[in-house]
Amino acid sequence: MLSMKYSYYPGCTLRNKAKDLDEYARASARALGFELEEIEDWQCCGGVYPLGTDEIATKLSSVRALNQAKEKGQDLVTICSACHHVIKRVNDDMKNVEDIRTRANNYMQLEEPYAGETTVLHFLEVLRDRVGFDTLKEKVVNPLKGKKIGAYYGCLLLRPGKIMAFDNPENPSVIEDFIRAIGAEPVIYPYRNECCGGYISLKEKEMAENMLSLIHISEPT
């Protein structure tokens, strides 16, 4: 497999609570023949995609990262599902919503306007579509034989389906395929692709807790 470089946006969580995930992803990338080249001076994506049509300033950090990848001629890779959701949706805005594109570019004052040219990929998409799970399986040194793992997708990776284009929103399989590739057995259970209530946890705490409890108590099918 040819060595490739991807622009990489780690995001805040992978710099704090999930440092191990960042380190393992970089090491795995090297072992599989590609490199994650971290975006310079990246800023927080905001963690939540702004739904207001007049929200421009909160999208600028994503536009900046996307433009840096464009200038390098590289695809942009993310790992955090929240970052991936925000950046991919902002990229879609810059590509398809003229008012947002114009106003964001006016704020940024870039040498060349950004118009959604960068391809945004989740790390799992690189493994599935660029590396291939068969190749990954061959590279595994210590397969997780005998382990049973249940994947939780949530909604950020999958919806809205036409924009995220990550997997089938109703019946995703990419994480289960990854689990098989590393030697473990995937466990299918209800609510694995349902919302955990993260977006409403501050305003509707009880509702969010109820949504989360459904995921916790669901039994494998």
Where are these regions (language model features)?
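Residue-level detector of conserved catalytic or cofactor/ligand-binding positions
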Residues: I215-T221
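Extreme N-terminal starter segment of soluble prokaryotic enzymes
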Residues: L2-S7
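Hydrophobic, aromatic-enriched interface-forming segments
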Residues: N142-D177
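Short connector loops at secondary-structure junctions
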Residues: E35-E55, L156, A181-M207
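Short catalytic helix/loop segments, enriched in acidic residues and glycine
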Residues: D22-L36, P169-R180
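Short mixed-charge
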Residues: D93-E117
